[in-house]
Every structure is written in structure tokens, then in C-alpha cells.
Amino acid sequence: MVREILEVLEKCPLAQYALGKDLVRVLPPTPHGFEVIIEQIWENHYSVTYGGWHEDFYSLEEALGCFSLGLTDHCRLKVCSKDGNPFRWTVEYWDDPHWRKRSTKATWSHRIFAPEVTAYMQNDLLPEIDVQPMLNKLVAPHCSRV
């Protein structure tokens, strides 16, 4: 798994990353970016994390596609916070001419009456790849939710 990830990161000369036992963590390139992590949970089970959002995959190819997409400007993370505490993360992808929702992860917030603040985080580390094949594979299972 690490070899395949390093092949992707070779195309990202500005990427700062750390290797762990079974994971690779790419740091946000700017204060407006988000961390991207790919982790092998066990054989044929992978998790990809963007900030507070995550998804499990049972194919390395799909996990690598999601990991790579998070490094591009065709993906953004919508982060909702209350009193400076993030509680909902939505992954959106660019489907010209609109941003489309892929999926959302959330935690409970006891700050019920606090106003919600939305921020959009985006990376631009892997700009010159053809993202359409990745989008087709990653979005197809979620079409009913889009």
C-alpha cells in the first residue's frame, strides 16, 4: 500500500507527509486546506480521512482514488462549527458547473443555540491529474444521495 501512495505523492512536490506503521498522513498545504490520511485497517480494509470526515473502503484502488481526490482542487471539505468547535464535515466534489455533495459525517454538538459557521477547506497539491475516472468510481455508489 505504501508504495502506491508514494507514487501518488511523487506527483505532489509541495506535499508534506508523514509515514506511520500502516498509514500515510498528508498535512494541509495552507491554513485553508485539510489533512488527508489513508490507513490500512487490515488486509483489504482501508480508511481515508479528510479532517473530521472518513470513509472505509474494501479495495485499495478505491481508497487510493479517494486519497488522491482529497489532494486535488476538485474536492473540498465543508466544515460546520459552533463556537469554534467543528461538528459536521461534508465532502463535496466539482461536477462542472456545480459542487455536489458526496457524503457527510457529524458528531453531536451540545451547543444547540449557538450560530453555525461554515468554512470550506480545499487542497491543491495534485492539480494535473485526470480526476474524472476517480470521480466516476467514487460517486457511483453515492448517486442516490447526491
Walk through the language-model features, giving the residues of each.
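A short, charged, amphipathic alpha-helix used as a generic interaction element across diverse proteins
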Residues: 59-71
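Acidic, proline/glycine-rich low-complexity IDRs
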Residues: 72-146
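Short, hydrophobic/proline-enriched secondary-structure or compact coil segments at domain edges
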Residues: 46-50, 91
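Amphipathic alpha-helical segments
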Residues: 1-13
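Short, solvent-exposed coil/turn segments at beta-strand boundaries
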Residues: 31, 40-46, 71-74, 96
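A short, exposed loop/beta-hairpin motif centered on an aromatic-Gly-Thr core
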Residues: 49-59
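Amphipathic, interaction-prone secondary-structure segments
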Residues: 14-44
